[in-house]
UniProtKB/Swiss-Prot annotation:
Keyword annotations from UniProtKB, A to Z: FAD, Flavoprotein, Monooxygenase, NADP, Oxidoreductase, Pyridine nucleotide biosynthesis
Name this polypeptide is given: Kynurenine 3-monooxygenase
Pathway as given in its UniProt record: Cofactor biosynthesis; NAD(+) biosynthesis; quinolinate from L-kynurenine: step 1/3
Disulphide bond pairs: none
Organism (species): Flavobacterium psychrophilum (strain ATCC 49511 / DSM 21280 / CIP 103535 / JIP02/86)
InterPro entries: FAD-bd, FAD/NAD-bd_sf, Kynurenine_monooxygenase
Cofactor: FAD
Length: 447
Protein backbone atom coordinates (compact mmCIF):
# COMPACT_ATOMS: atom_id res chain seq x y z
CA UNK A 1 0.00 0.00 0.00
CA UNK A 2 1.21 3.50 -0.85
CA UNK A 3 1.83 6.37 1.54
CA UNK A 4 -1.55 8.06 2.04
CA UNK A 5 -2.11 11.19 -0.05
CA UNK A 6 -4.95 13.71 -0.18
CA UNK A 7 -6.24 13.42 -3.74
CA UNK A 8 -8.94 15.34 -5.65
CA UNK A 9 -10.73 13.93 -8.68
CA UNK A 10 -12.59 16.45 -10.83
CA UNK A 11 -15.49 14.66 -12.51
CA UNK A 12 -17.90 12.13 -10.98
CA UNK A 13 -18.56 10.22 -14.20
CA UNK A 14 -17.69 6.60 -14.85
CA UNK A 15 -13.91 7.05 -14.95
CA UNK A 16 -13.78 9.43 -11.99
CA UNK A 17 -15.87 7.08 -9.85
CA UNK A 18 -13.83 3.97 -10.70
CA UNK A 19 -10.56 5.86 -10.16
CA UNK A 20 -11.84 6.85 -6.71
CA UNK A 21 -12.32 3.16 -5.83
CA UNK A 22 -8.77 2.27 -6.93
CA UNK A 23 -7.24 5.18 -5.00
CA UNK A 24 -9.20 4.30 -1.85
CA UNK A 25 -7.93 0.74 -2.23
CA UNK A 26 -4.40 2.13 -1.85
CA UNK A 27 -5.33 4.02 1.33
CA UNK A 28 -5.63 7.56 -0.03
CA UNK A 29 -8.07 10.27 1.02
CA UNK A 30 -10.24 10.88 -2.05
CA UNK A 31 -12.54 13.84 -2.75
CA UNK A 32 -14.55 13.84 -5.99
CA UNK A 33 -15.92 17.14 -7.33
CA UNK A 34 -18.55 17.72 -10.00
CA UNK A 35 -20.20 20.90 -11.26
CA UNK A 36 -23.45 19.01 -11.93
CA UNK A 37 -26.04 17.84 -9.38
CA UNK A 38 -25.82 14.29 -8.04
CA UNK A 39 -26.96 12.10 -10.98
CA UNK A 40 -28.70 9.83 -8.46
CA UNK A 41 -31.22 12.59 -7.74
CA UNK A 42 -32.12 13.69 -11.28
CA UNK A 43 -33.88 12.38 -14.39
CA UNK A 44 -31.77 11.25 -17.34
CA UNK A 45 -31.23 13.87 -20.03
CA UNK A 46 -32.12 12.11 -23.29
CA UNK A 47 -28.63 12.50 -24.76
CA UNK A 48 -26.86 9.32 -23.70
CA UNK A 49 -25.56 6.57 -25.95
CA UNK A 50 -25.93 3.21 -24.21
CA UNK A 51 -22.58 1.72 -23.30
CA UNK A 52 -21.07 -1.50 -24.66
CA UNK A 53 -18.94 -3.02 -21.91
CA UNK A 54 -16.25 -5.41 -23.16
CA UNK A 55 -13.16 -7.17 -21.81
CA UNK A 56 -11.09 -4.08 -21.00
CA UNK A 57 -13.92 -2.56 -18.99
CA UNK A 58 -14.66 -5.77 -17.08
CA UNK A 59 -10.94 -6.23 -16.42
CA UNK A 60 -10.78 -2.81 -14.74
CA UNK A 61 -13.97 -3.38 -12.72
CA UNK A 62 -12.78 -6.83 -11.60
CA UNK A 63 -9.41 -5.34 -10.63
CA UNK A 64 -11.26 -3.00 -8.27
CA UNK A 65 -13.33 -5.89 -6.93
CA UNK A 66 -16.65 -4.51 -8.19
CA UNK A 67 -17.23 -6.40 -11.47
CA UNK A 68 -19.83 -8.75 -10.01
CA UNK A 69 -21.75 -5.80 -8.56
CA UNK A 70 -22.13 -4.41 -12.09
CA UNK A 71 -22.82 -7.60 -14.06
CA UNK A 72 -26.45 -7.80 -12.96
CA UNK A 73 -27.24 -4.45 -14.64
CA UNK A 74 -25.70 -5.57 -17.97
CA UNK A 75 -27.34 -7.41 -20.89
CA UNK A 76 -25.24 -9.75 -23.04
CA UNK A 77 -25.23 -8.94 -26.78
CA UNK A 78 -23.77 -11.86 -28.73
CA UNK A 79 -24.30 -10.48 -32.23
CA UNK A 80 -25.08 -7.57 -34.51
CA UNK A 81 -28.56 -7.58 -36.05
CA UNK A 82 -28.29 -5.78 -39.40
CA UNK A 83 -31.61 -4.37 -40.66
CA UNK A 84 -31.54 -3.88 -44.45
CA UNK A 85 -34.94 -3.40 -46.11
CA UNK A 86 -37.15 -6.15 -44.72
CA UNK A 87 -34.17 -8.46 -44.23
CA UNK A 88 -32.45 -9.17 -40.93
CA UNK A 89 -28.88 -10.49 -41.02
CA UNK A 90 -27.02 -11.60 -37.90
CA UNK A 91 -23.24 -11.27 -37.42
CA UNK A 92 -21.95 -13.03 -34.31
CA UNK A 93 -19.21 -11.16 -32.46
CA UNK A 94 -16.68 -13.56 -30.98
CA UNK A 95 -15.17 -16.78 -32.30
CA UNK A 96 -15.78 -18.51 -28.96
CA UNK A 97 -19.23 -17.09 -28.27
CA UNK A 98 -17.92 -13.93 -26.57
CA UNK A 99 -20.37 -11.10 -25.92
CA UNK A 100 -20.37 -7.39 -25.39
CA UNK A 101 -22.72 -6.03 -22.73
CA UNK A 102 -25.29 -3.25 -22.97
CA UNK A 103 -25.47 -0.97 -19.94
CA UNK A 104 -27.36 2.29 -19.50
CA UNK A 105 -24.84 5.08 -18.87
CA UNK A 106 -27.07 6.68 -16.24
CA UNK A 107 -27.73 3.41 -14.39
CA UNK A 108 -24.01 2.54 -14.39
CA UNK A 109 -22.95 6.02 -13.28
CA UNK A 110 -25.32 5.90 -10.32
CA UNK A 111 -24.00 2.46 -9.40
CA UNK A 112 -20.35 3.55 -9.66
CA UNK A 113 -20.89 6.55 -7.37
CA UNK A 114 -22.59 4.27 -4.82
CA UNK A 115 -19.66 1.84 -4.98
CA UNK A 116 -17.08 4.64 -4.65
CA UNK A 117 -18.90 6.03 -1.60
CA UNK A 118 -18.99 2.53 -0.10
CA UNK A 119 -15.21 2.39 -0.62
CA UNK A 120 -14.86 5.63 1.37
CA UNK A 121 -14.57 8.34 -1.31
CA UNK A 122 -16.37 11.64 -0.59
CA UNK A 123 -18.39 13.36 -3.33
CA UNK A 124 -19.05 17.09 -3.61
CA UNK A 125 -21.70 17.98 -6.20
CA UNK A 126 -22.62 21.37 -7.69
CA UNK A 127 -19.06 22.55 -7.09
CA UNK A 128 -17.70 24.54 -10.01
CA UNK A 129 -13.95 24.18 -10.51
CA UNK A 130 -12.67 27.14 -12.51
CA UNK A 131 -8.92 26.65 -12.31
CA UNK A 132 -6.14 24.56 -10.80
CA UNK A 133 -2.67 25.65 -9.74
CA UNK A 134 -0.50 23.05 -11.43
CA UNK A 135 2.56 23.50 -9.21
CA UNK A 136 0.81 22.83 -5.90
CA UNK A 137 -2.43 21.01 -6.89
CA UNK A 138 -4.73 23.71 -5.53
CA UNK A 139 -8.29 23.75 -6.86
CA UNK A 140 -10.03 27.09 -7.29
CA UNK A 141 -13.80 26.94 -7.10
CA UNK A 142 -16.70 29.32 -6.82
CA UNK A 143 -20.22 30.13 -7.99
CA UNK A 144 -19.15 32.08 -11.08
CA UNK A 145 -16.01 32.35 -13.19
CA UNK A 146 -15.55 36.02 -12.36
CA UNK A 147 -16.79 35.90 -8.76
CA UNK A 148 -15.02 35.05 -5.54
CA UNK A 149 -13.10 31.76 -5.50
CA UNK A 150 -12.22 29.39 -2.70
CA UNK A 151 -8.86 27.61 -2.78
CA UNK A 152 -8.65 23.97 -1.67
CA UNK A 153 -5.21 22.33 -1.62
CA UNK A 154 -4.40 18.70 -2.40
CA UNK A 155 -1.35 16.53 -2.85
CA UNK A 156 -2.51 15.78 -6.38
CA UNK A 157 -5.45 16.35 -8.73
CA UNK A 158 -6.90 14.08 -11.43
CA UNK A 159 -8.89 15.62 -14.27
CA UNK A 160 -11.63 13.11 -15.14
CA UNK A 161 -13.98 15.85 -16.31
CA UNK A 162 -14.58 14.77 -19.89
CA UNK A 163 -13.89 15.95 -23.42
CA UNK A 164 -14.24 19.63 -22.51
CA UNK A 165 -12.17 19.29 -19.31
CA UNK A 166 -11.55 22.35 -17.17
CA UNK A 167 -8.36 20.78 -15.82
CA UNK A 168 -7.03 20.20 -19.34
CA UNK A 169 -8.01 23.76 -20.25
CA UNK A 170 -5.60 24.94 -17.55
CA UNK A 171 -2.84 22.62 -18.80
CA UNK A 172 -3.31 23.98 -22.34
CA UNK A 173 -1.96 27.32 -21.17
CA UNK A 174 1.48 25.75 -20.70
CA UNK A 175 4.21 25.99 -23.30
CA UNK A 176 4.72 22.82 -25.41
CA UNK A 177 1.23 21.44 -24.70
CA UNK A 178 -0.17 19.81 -27.85
CA UNK A 179 -3.92 19.82 -28.36
CA UNK A 180 -6.35 19.11 -31.20
CA UNK A 181 -10.07 18.55 -31.53
CA UNK A 182 -11.94 17.32 -34.58
CA UNK A 183 -15.73 17.33 -34.81
CA UNK A 184 -17.56 14.96 -37.15
CA UNK A 185 -20.11 16.55 -39.49
CA UNK A 186 -22.39 13.86 -38.06
CA UNK A 187 -24.34 14.33 -34.83
CA UNK A 188 -26.57 12.04 -32.82
CA UNK A 189 -30.01 12.00 -31.23
CA UNK A 190 -31.52 9.53 -28.78
CA UNK A 191 -34.83 7.78 -29.54
CA UNK A 192 -36.71 5.16 -27.54
CA UNK A 193 -38.30 1.76 -28.24
CA UNK A 194 -40.51 0.94 -25.22
CA UNK A 195 -41.13 -2.58 -23.94
CA UNK A 196 -44.25 -4.51 -24.91
CA UNK A 197 -47.16 -4.18 -22.44
CA UNK A 198 -46.07 -7.47 -20.80
CA UNK A 199 -42.50 -6.18 -20.34
CA UNK A 200 -41.02 -8.26 -23.18
CA UNK A 201 -38.69 -6.90 -25.88
CA UNK A 202 -39.95 -5.73 -29.27
CA UNK A 203 -36.64 -6.74 -30.92
CA UNK A 204 -34.12 -9.51 -30.25
CA UNK A 205 -32.82 -8.82 -26.74
CA UNK A 206 -29.30 -10.18 -27.20
CA UNK A 207 -28.36 -8.18 -30.30
CA UNK A 208 -26.92 -4.77 -31.04
CA UNK A 209 -29.33 -3.63 -33.76
CA UNK A 210 -27.98 -1.57 -36.66
CA UNK A 211 -29.86 0.06 -39.55
CA UNK A 212 -26.95 1.03 -41.87
CA UNK A 213 -27.95 3.59 -44.48
CA UNK A 214 -24.72 5.11 -45.78
CA UNK A 215 -24.41 8.65 -44.47
CA UNK A 216 -26.81 8.03 -41.60
CA UNK A 217 -27.60 5.04 -39.42
CA UNK A 218 -29.69 4.00 -36.45
CA UNK A 219 -28.54 1.69 -33.66
CA UNK A 220 -30.50 0.19 -30.75
CA UNK A 221 -29.20 -1.38 -27.52
CA UNK A 222 -31.36 -3.25 -24.97
CA UNK A 223 -32.21 -2.03 -21.46
CA UNK A 224 -33.16 -4.10 -18.42
CA UNK A 225 -36.81 -2.97 -18.48
CA UNK A 226 -37.55 -4.43 -21.95
CA UNK A 227 -36.94 -1.16 -23.80
CA UNK A 228 -34.19 -0.20 -26.25
CA UNK A 229 -32.18 3.00 -26.33
CA UNK A 230 -31.82 4.03 -29.97
CA UNK A 231 -29.29 6.46 -31.35
CA UNK A 232 -29.75 8.12 -34.73
CA UNK A 233 -26.43 9.22 -36.27
CA UNK A 234 -26.91 11.69 -39.10
CA UNK A 235 -25.22 14.67 -40.82
CA UNK A 236 -26.11 18.06 -39.37
CA UNK A 237 -26.71 19.63 -42.81
CA UNK A 238 -27.70 18.57 -46.33
CA UNK A 239 -30.06 15.96 -47.74
CA UNK A 240 -31.19 13.42 -45.12
CA UNK A 241 -29.85 15.49 -42.23
CA UNK A 242 -31.03 16.84 -38.90
CA UNK A 243 -31.48 20.25 -40.54
CA UNK A 244 -33.71 18.78 -43.28
CA UNK A 245 -36.04 17.04 -40.80
CA UNK A 246 -37.51 20.22 -39.37
CA UNK A 247 -41.14 19.25 -38.79
CA UNK A 248 -43.20 16.27 -37.65
CA UNK A 249 -44.44 15.33 -41.14
CA UNK A 250 -40.91 15.21 -42.57
CA UNK A 251 -39.64 13.05 -39.68
CA UNK A 252 -42.51 10.57 -40.00
CA UNK A 253 -42.20 10.42 -43.80
CA UNK A 254 -38.42 9.93 -43.58
CA UNK A 255 -38.71 7.00 -41.17
CA UNK A 256 -41.59 5.43 -43.12
CA UNK A 257 -39.54 5.51 -46.32
CA UNK A 258 -36.04 4.71 -45.03
CA UNK A 259 -36.49 2.87 -41.73
CA UNK A 260 -39.94 1.29 -42.17
CA UNK A 261 -39.47 -1.53 -39.66
CA UNK A 262 -38.90 1.01 -36.87
CA UNK A 263 -42.17 2.91 -37.31
CA UNK A 264 -44.29 0.47 -35.32
CA UNK A 265 -41.75 0.04 -32.51
CA UNK A 266 -41.01 3.76 -31.85
CA UNK A 267 -44.50 5.03 -30.95
CA UNK A 268 -43.34 8.49 -29.79
CA UNK A 269 -40.99 9.06 -32.71
CA UNK A 270 -41.75 12.71 -33.48
CA UNK A 271 -42.01 13.67 -29.79
CA UNK A 272 -38.63 12.05 -29.04
CA UNK A 273 -37.07 13.56 -32.13
CA UNK A 274 -37.91 17.14 -31.23
CA UNK A 275 -37.66 16.81 -27.44
CA UNK A 276 -34.21 15.21 -27.29
CA UNK A 277 -31.16 17.33 -28.16
CA UNK A 278 -28.94 16.82 -31.20
CA UNK A 279 -25.44 16.28 -29.84
CA UNK A 280 -21.97 16.56 -31.37
CA UNK A 281 -19.24 13.92 -31.78
CA UNK A 282 -15.63 14.93 -31.19
CA UNK A 283 -12.19 13.34 -31.25
CA UNK A 284 -9.81 15.14 -28.89
CA UNK A 285 -6.09 14.47 -28.54
CA UNK A 286 -3.55 16.14 -26.30
CA UNK A 287 -0.14 15.64 -24.69
CA UNK A 288 1.35 15.69 -22.10
CA UNK A 289 -1.37 14.28 -19.85
CA UNK A 290 0.45 15.02 -16.58
CA UNK A 291 2.25 17.82 -14.78
CA UNK A 292 5.11 16.73 -12.51
CA UNK A 293 3.67 14.62 -9.67
CA UNK A 294 0.74 16.99 -9.15
CA UNK A 295 -1.86 16.80 -11.93
CA UNK A 296 -2.96 14.09 -14.37
CA UNK A 297 -5.67 13.77 -17.02
CA UNK A 298 -7.55 10.50 -17.45
CA UNK A 299 -10.37 9.15 -19.64
CA UNK A 300 -12.07 11.55 -22.06
CA UNK A 301 -10.20 14.50 -20.52
CA UNK A 302 -7.02 13.01 -22.03
CA UNK A 303 -8.42 11.39 -25.19
CA UNK A 304 -12.04 11.81 -26.28
CA UNK A 305 -13.06 9.48 -29.13
CA UNK A 306 -16.15 8.94 -31.25
CA UNK A 307 -18.36 6.08 -29.99
CA UNK A 308 -18.28 3.74 -32.98
CA UNK A 309 -16.12 0.99 -31.49
CA UNK A 310 -17.95 1.02 -28.17
CA UNK A 311 -14.56 1.65 -26.53
CA UNK A 312 -14.82 5.12 -24.93
CA UNK A 313 -15.66 3.86 -21.44
CA UNK A 314 -13.55 0.72 -21.91
CA UNK A 315 -10.51 2.83 -22.87
CA UNK A 316 -11.08 5.18 -19.93
CA UNK A 317 -11.35 2.26 -17.52
CA UNK A 318 -8.19 0.74 -19.03
CA UNK A 319 -6.36 4.03 -18.32
CA UNK A 320 -7.00 3.28 -14.66
CA UNK A 321 -5.74 -0.30 -15.01
CA UNK A 322 -2.47 0.99 -16.52
CA UNK A 323 -2.16 3.77 -13.90
CA UNK A 324 -2.69 1.21 -11.13
CA UNK A 325 0.00 -1.06 -12.64
CA UNK A 326 2.41 1.90 -12.47
CA UNK A 327 1.38 2.56 -8.85
CA UNK A 328 2.22 -1.06 -8.00
CA UNK A 329 5.55 -0.85 -9.82
CA UNK A 330 6.81 2.55 -8.65
CA UNK A 331 5.39 2.79 -5.12
CA UNK A 332 5.37 6.38 -3.85
CA UNK A 333 7.29 7.87 -6.80
CA UNK A 334 4.33 9.69 -8.33
CA UNK A 335 6.47 11.63 -10.79
CA UNK A 336 7.57 8.34 -12.39
CA UNK A 337 4.07 6.85 -12.06
CA UNK A 338 2.60 9.76 -14.03
CA UNK A 339 5.41 9.82 -16.59
CA UNK A 340 5.22 6.07 -17.30
CA UNK A 341 1.39 6.13 -17.35
CA UNK A 342 1.20 8.78 -20.09
CA UNK A 343 4.12 7.29 -22.05
CA UNK A 344 2.53 3.83 -22.00
CA UNK A 345 -1.00 4.96 -22.72
CA UNK A 346 -0.74 7.71 -25.34
CA UNK A 347 0.00 5.46 -28.39
CA UNK A 348 -2.96 3.25 -27.46
CA UNK A 349 -5.28 6.24 -27.02
CA UNK A 350 -4.31 7.47 -30.50
CA UNK A 351 -4.84 3.97 -31.92
CA UNK A 352 -8.37 3.56 -30.54
CA UNK A 353 -9.25 7.06 -31.78
CA UNK A 354 -8.25 5.98 -35.30
CA UNK A 355 -10.02 2.62 -35.01
CA UNK A 356 -13.21 4.28 -33.73
CA UNK A 357 -13.33 6.66 -36.67
CA UNK A 358 -12.77 3.79 -39.12
CA UNK A 359 -15.52 1.76 -37.48
CA UNK A 360 -17.94 4.62 -38.13
CA UNK A 361 -17.29 4.08 -41.84
CA UNK A 362 -17.69 0.32 -41.42
CA UNK A 363 -20.94 0.46 -39.47
CA UNK A 364 -22.62 3.10 -41.61
CA UNK A 365 -21.63 1.91 -45.08
CA UNK A 366 -19.75 -1.39 -45.19
CA UNK A 367 -22.14 -3.55 -43.12
CA UNK A 368 -24.53 -3.34 -46.09
CA UNK A 369 -21.77 -4.10 -48.63
CA UNK A 370 -21.65 -7.66 -50.04
CA UNK A 371 -17.87 -7.65 -50.59
CA UNK A 372 -17.32 -6.55 -46.99
CA UNK A 373 -19.66 -9.25 -45.69
CA UNK A 374 -17.79 -11.83 -47.77
CA UNK A 375 -14.49 -10.58 -46.32
CA UNK A 376 -15.85 -11.04 -42.79
CA UNK A 377 -17.04 -14.56 -43.65
CA UNK A 378 -13.60 -15.53 -45.01
CA UNK A 379 -11.87 -14.06 -41.95
CA UNK A 380 -14.16 -15.96 -39.56
CA UNK A 381 -13.72 -19.19 -41.52
CA UNK A 382 -9.93 -18.92 -41.55
CA UNK A 383 -9.77 -17.80 -37.90
CA UNK A 384 -11.89 -20.78 -36.81
CA UNK A 385 -9.43 -23.15 -38.55
CA UNK A 386 -6.28 -21.30 -37.45
CA UNK A 387 -7.11 -19.38 -34.26
CA UNK A 388 -3.40 -19.08 -33.45
CA UNK A 389 -2.67 -17.45 -36.84
CA UNK A 390 -5.62 -15.06 -37.22
CA UNK A 391 -7.48 -13.12 -34.56
CA UNK A 392 -9.89 -10.69 -36.29
CA UNK A 393 -9.34 -6.99 -35.54
CA UNK A 394 -12.68 -6.60 -33.78
CA UNK A 395 -11.81 -9.47 -31.44
CA UNK A 396 -8.38 -7.98 -30.68
CA UNK A 397 -9.97 -4.68 -29.70
CA UNK A 398 -13.04 -5.99 -27.92
CA UNK A 399 -12.23 -9.39 -26.46
CA UNK A 400 -8.61 -8.96 -25.37
CA UNK A 401 -6.55 -6.60 -23.24
CA UNK A 402 -3.60 -6.45 -25.64
CA UNK A 403 -2.60 -2.86 -26.57
CA UNK A 404 -4.87 -1.00 -28.99
CA UNK A 405 -1.76 0.06 -30.96
CA UNK A 406 -0.88 -3.60 -31.52
CA UNK A 407 -4.44 -4.31 -32.69
CA UNK A 408 -4.26 -1.41 -35.17
CA UNK A 409 -0.92 -2.52 -36.64
CA UNK A 410 -1.90 -6.19 -37.00
CA UNK A 411 -5.34 -5.20 -38.30
CA UNK A 412 -3.76 -3.11 -41.06
CA UNK A 413 -1.57 -6.07 -42.08
CA UNK A 414 -4.59 -8.39 -42.13
CA UNK A 415 -6.51 -5.90 -44.26
CA UNK A 416 -3.79 -5.91 -46.95
CA UNK A 417 -3.98 -9.72 -47.02
CA UNK A 418 -7.77 -9.72 -47.36
CA UNK A 419 -7.68 -7.20 -50.20
CA UNK A 420 -5.35 -9.60 -52.08
CA UNK A 421 -7.68 -12.53 -51.38
CA UNK A 422 -10.77 -10.63 -52.59
CA UNK A 423 -9.05 -10.03 -55.96
CA UNK A 424 -8.93 -13.79 -56.65
CA UNK A 425 -11.21 -14.86 -59.51
CA UNK A 426 -14.54 -16.40 -58.42
CA UNK A 427 -13.72 -15.79 -54.76
CA UNK A 428 -17.47 -15.40 -54.08
CA UNK A 429 -18.01 -19.12 -54.71
CA UNK A 430 -14.56 -20.62 -54.03
CA UNK A 431 -13.56 -19.09 -50.70
CA UNK A 432 -13.93 -22.22 -48.54
CA UNK A 433 -11.11 -24.07 -50.29
CA UNK A 434 -7.62 -25.33 -49.51
CA UNK A 435 -6.26 -23.04 -52.21
CA UNK A 436 -7.53 -19.94 -50.36
CA UNK A 437 -6.36 -21.36 -47.05
CA UNK A 438 -2.82 -21.85 -48.38
CA UNK A 439 -2.81 -18.40 -50.03
CA UNK A 440 -3.67 -16.68 -46.73
CA UNK A 441 -0.96 -18.65 -44.91
CA UNK A 442 1.55 -17.73 -47.63
CA UNK A 443 0.67 -14.02 -47.30
CA UNK A 444 0.88 -14.22 -43.50
CA UNK A 445 4.35 -15.77 -43.74
CA UNK A 446 5.53 -13.06 -46.14
CA UNK A 447 5.70 -10.48 -43.35
Amino acid sequence: MQKSQKIAIVGSGLVGSLLAIYLKKEGHTVHVYDRSPDIRTIQFSGRSINLAMSNRGWNALDGAGVGDKVRHIAIAMEKRAIHIGNQLNFQHYGLQGECIYSISRGVLNRKMIDLAEEAGAEFFFEQKIWDVNLTDATLQMGETERGEWTNVSYDMVFGADGAFSRIRHRMQRQSMFNYSQDFLNTGYKELHIPANPDGSYKLDKHSLHIWPRGKYMLIALPNLDGSFTCTLFMPFEGENSFASLDNRQKVEAFFAENLPDTVDVIPDLAEDFFKNPTSTLVTMKCFPWTYSDKVALIGDAAHAIVPFYGQGMNAGFEDITILYQMMQEYGNDWKTIFSEYEKSRKPDADAIAELSYRNFMEMSTKTANEKFLLQKKIERWFASKYPEKWIPLYDRVTFSTRPYSEALAIGDFQETIMQEILKIENIETNWETEEIEHKIIQLLNSK
